[in-house]
Amino acid sequence: MVGCDLLWLAAASCVLTLVSPSTIHQGYGRPRNSSNLDLDCGSPDSPSSGICFDPCQNHTVLNDPTRSTENNDSSVAWCDDNLHGWYRFVGDGGVKMPETCVSVFRCHTSAPMWLSGSHPILGDGIVSHTACANWNENCCFWRSEVQVKACSEELGEYHVYKLQGTPECSLRYCTDPSTAPKNCEITCRPEEECVFQNNNWSCVCRQDLHVSDSQSLQPLLDCGDNEIKVKLDKCLLGGMGFKEEIIAYLNDRNCNGTMQDEPNNWVSMTSPVVANYCGNILEKNGTHAIYRNTLSLATDFIIRDFRVNVNFQCAYPLDMSVSLETALQPIVSSLTVDVDGAGEFNVKMALFQDQSYTNPYEGAEVLLPVESILYVGVLLNRGDTSRFKLLLTNCYATPSEDRHDPVKYFIIKNRCPNQRDSTINVRENGVSSESRFSVQMFMFAGNYDLVFLHCEVYLCDSTTEQCQPSCSTNRLRSSRPAIDYNRVLDLGPITKRSAQSSATSKGTPHTTGFLLAWPMFFLPVFLALLF
């Protein structure tokens, strides 16, 4: 129980006690006939009626962050029915009582109490106010008289409160966390302020922020493989007049939505990495593919007078994957491979124009002179590429689109290149998520217009298997491989262009013609069947 007993009639020292955490400040009284409104004097009928004291020097300190209005822990409802006397609130929960109604079940109690009125300033002396308790949808369901005085010290001003318990339980006097001292342990941006809420310091958007220059709204970009995430500063948007719900549109107005909240006071919207989708503009140079778009912001879905337009772009280094994604009509084959215990993987095979593997052939077919080098790239573009490596076990050409065609010219056989064909160059196989090789056209095209490529793929578990091939002479002479045709990718047709093209057969040639019409082709095929 808090109280103030008369210790001496002449010169009394009033000592206040309270369960920790608290600090006791002591002061000396003055005769009751003092006319100074800064002093608190005992009741006329009490033993201390002749004693007056300054509550700025004689009060109990309450350092309890659970009194913060941000505290919504209602597991235990505490009550202040035992608080009688002068008190000063300190600490991270706030140093002043709130001056507006507080929601129920805040401040670690059921019915939180707040100050109905403005705090006095220095020179006002002791001011009487009503403390209200919110309950039953009534911000002032219970009332209690509170006296308040503004005080000063070297570090600034503060307030003390004379409390008289509470009308009922569980009622508790709250503190406003926005008045807490700025002993912030984190660094906030200039458009933020540091506040103590939910028992932690955090950065929140400044309420007094006013922004007129939209150029200050610089986006943060997350250039992902499948989408671009555009993040904007939520505080700056608030300073421009935007509310919690911000509607964003891309160049294609059908691509719109509410910007999503991100950590640290940012909001975001995503744009797919697809050419011409949602108004994306794709540009390519020799090294990068660049996607451009504009994010237009509005306050709702009806108003079309966009207040802010934010241009953004993401540049992707050209590689096999990006070049295929940005090509309009690449010649590509796709296969889904299921691996027990590891899920589904997607594998793609495409034809490229040069050894950079960034310029895929586009259109319905490829037309090449017989002396051309054909560049073939295969990539694993979905799945755990850190664990599984892409391995080409068998790659071969056929005179028809039938992958089962018995006439096969092997480029890669049993994981190793055909060493009898000096034009074959396997640049990568079994070491990453990509495999690539090249071969000269005339070595397998024969004297016919159309040929087809087929590659059997295997996803090698690098944690349990040796994935990079070891190609010895004995291995090269091994028997004809058993091909799993369910894991074969097909490409074609590849059309051969030559001076005698008018005399060659058109369409898909039959097997006999593929072998015999061009004598130069017979020997490589015969040797390929043997090795």
Swiss-Prot record:
Tissue/organ expression? Specifically expressed by M (microfold) cells which are atypical epithelial cells of the intestine.
List, for all copies, the residue spans of the domain called ZP.
Answer: 222-478
The record's section on SMART domains has: ZP
Keywords for the protein's UniProt record, in alphabetical order: Cell membrane, Cytoplasmic vesicle, Disulfide bond, EGF-like domain, Endosome, Glycoprotein, GPI-anchor, Immunity, Innate immunity, Lipoprotein, Membrane, Receptor, Secreted, Signal
Region annotated ZP-N, chain positions: 222-315
Disrupted-gene phenotype: Knockout mice lacking Gp2 fail to induce antigen-specific helper-T-cells and antibody immune responses after oral immunization with FimH positive bacteria. This is not due to a general defect in the immunological functions, since a normal response is induced by other systemic immunizations.
| Annotated segments matching region ZP-C | 340-478
Q: Which Cys-Cys disulphide bridges does the record give? A: C41-C52, C56-C151, C79-C169, C101-C139, C107-C174, C132-C140, C184-C194, C188-C203, C205-C235, C223-C314, C255-C278, C395-C455, C416-C471, C460-C467
Q: Where does this chain mainly localize?
A: membrane
Methyltransferase is among the record's keywords:
no
Stretches for region Beta hairpin: 34-53
**Where found, per UniProt?**
Zymogen granule membrane; Secreted; Cell membrane; Apical cell membrane
Lineage top rank: taxon: Eukaryota
Q: How is it modified after translation?
A: N-glycosylated.
According to its record, what are the GO cellular component terms?
Answer: apical plasma membrane; endosome; external side of plasma membrane; extracellular space; membrane raft; zymogen granule membrane
> What are the annotated glycosylation sites?
N33, N58, N72, N200, N256, N285
Q: Where is the signal peptide?
A: 1-21
Domain comment (free text): Each ZP domain consists of an N-terminal (ZP-N) and C-terminal (ZP-C) region connected by a flexible linker; the linker allows the ZP domain to wrap around the ZP-C subdomain of the preceding subunit.
What is the name attached to this protein's record?
Answer: Pancreatic secretory granule membrane major glycoprotein GP2
> Its gene?
Gp2
